[in-house]
């Protein structure tokens, strides 16, 4: 089996005005994704998804990465990843057994493009083996607990919003704590207190600051929230401030989660060495695809850090994240978006299997296990412009 073509398709889904949420990132007006296809001479086609600006990702995939994949056997997924990662130095890197990453490919949008291609290659690989992708990765489980990820409502309205997630059956929920109606610690505490009222004492509650606070404020907020039994405080400070995040972790009893904006195992190695996190949240469509996220899972496990993949995006990204969760021993929970995300729920012919108790169950079909709807590419045609506006 050989790869014959690699292509990328930019996609968007506009958000109706009555369904837009606002955070420190701005008001969400659309969702973007890049769908990646890897075709083979066997007739099998794999699909992947990448984060990053879709037109830029598509150009990188089709004009730079495709040529490094065509002619390769997708069974050799590690080899193909190393070719994409090391670029022109891939041959000496493999011969010497030492990573020699191309300077432009270590992080950023090129790594996001590599991640998307890698997901598609693993999809083809598992299809060729005739087994679900999580089994090709090394199955640990066939279901995992999901948590409802949302929580934008202002003030006391957080009680009904988060309570609604619990009413759906989720035993863990997450809310945003910065940016909706003006940041202040008293306002954040008010919203978290309302959320706790809405979900009761037995549902886990996580909070997410989107990396928008400075260290001193993050510490003050964490200490103010400790009495509300917070399961984790996500991205308290900028993802570029690993030292600051470690300071926050040392200053609070709340576990610290982060990682959705990190690239490859090397970023996570730095977080681990600084003892900056308790829960790692790599995004499979950013951190390096299936190949690299397996390495991240093993690395974090060696440090006693749990895995909770970031899974906010298209249906392809969620499906890939689900397979990661099923194949990672240290994964304990999976993100399930509660925002308006038609590219997640309306992309495939088959529905996701999320049970009334909030557990997510893996498909038993080969590969990712999902088939694109015939009208998907037309329905989600790319729309130029930013995803968030102020």
Feature-to-residue mapping (PLM):
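Metal-dependent enolase-superfamily TIM-barrel catalytic cores that perform enediolate-based chemistry
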Residues: 142-252
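Glycine-rich, aromatic-flanked loop segments that form ligand/cofactor-binding clefts
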Residues: 108, 112, 118-154
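Shared catalytic-loop signature of beta/alpha-barrel
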Residues: 223, 229, 240-359, 363-366
């Amino acid at each position: 089996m050989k790869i014959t073509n690699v292509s990328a398709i930019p996609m968007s889904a506009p958000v109706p005005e009555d369904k837009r949420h606002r955070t420190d990132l701005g008001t969400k007006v659309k969702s973007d994704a890049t769908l990646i296809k890897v075709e083979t001479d066997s007739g099998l086609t794999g699909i992947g998804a990448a984060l990053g600006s879709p037109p830029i990702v598509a150009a990188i995939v089709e004009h730079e990465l495709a040529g490094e994949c065509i002619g390769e056997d997708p069974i050799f997924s590690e080899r193909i990843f190393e070719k994409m990662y090391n670029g022109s130095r891939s041959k000496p890197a493999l011969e010497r057994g030492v990573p020699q990453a191309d300077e432009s490919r270590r992080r950023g949008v090129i790594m996001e493009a590599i991640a998307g291609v890698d997901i598609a290659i693993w999809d083809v690989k598992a299809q060729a083996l005739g087994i679900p992708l999580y089994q090709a990765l090394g199955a640990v489980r066939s279901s995992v607990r999901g948590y409802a990820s949302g929580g934008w409502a202002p003030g006391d309205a957080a009680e009904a919003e988060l309570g609604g997630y619990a009413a759906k059956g989720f035993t863990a929920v997450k809310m945003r704590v910065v940016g909706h109606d003006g940041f202040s610690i008293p306002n954040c505490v008010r919203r978290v207190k309302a959320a706790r009222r809405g979900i009761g004492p037995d549902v886990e509650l996580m909070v997410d600051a989107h990396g928008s606070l400075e260290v001193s404020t993050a510490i003050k907020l964490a200490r103010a929230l400790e009495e509300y039994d917070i399961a984790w405080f996500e991205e308290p400070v900028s993802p570029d401030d690993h030292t600051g995040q470690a300071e926050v972790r040392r200053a609070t009893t709340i576990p610290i989660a982060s990682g959705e904006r990190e690239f490859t195992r090397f970023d996570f190695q730095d977080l681990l060495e600084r003892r900056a996190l308790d829960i790692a949240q790599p995004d499979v469509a950013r951190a390096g695809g299936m190949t690299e996220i397996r390495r991240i899972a093993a690395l974090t496990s060696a440090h006693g850090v749990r895995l909770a993949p970031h899974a906010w995006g298209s249906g392809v990204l969620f499906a890939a994240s689900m397979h990661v969760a099923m194949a990672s021993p240290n994964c304990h929970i999976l993100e399930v978006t509660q925002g308006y995300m038609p590219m997640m729920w309306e992309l495939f012919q088959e529905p996701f299997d999320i049970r009334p108790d909030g557990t997510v169950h893996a498909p038993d079909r080969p590969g990712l296990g999902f088939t694109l709807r015939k009208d998907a590419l037309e329905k989600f045609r790319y729309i130029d412009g930013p995803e968030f506006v102020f």
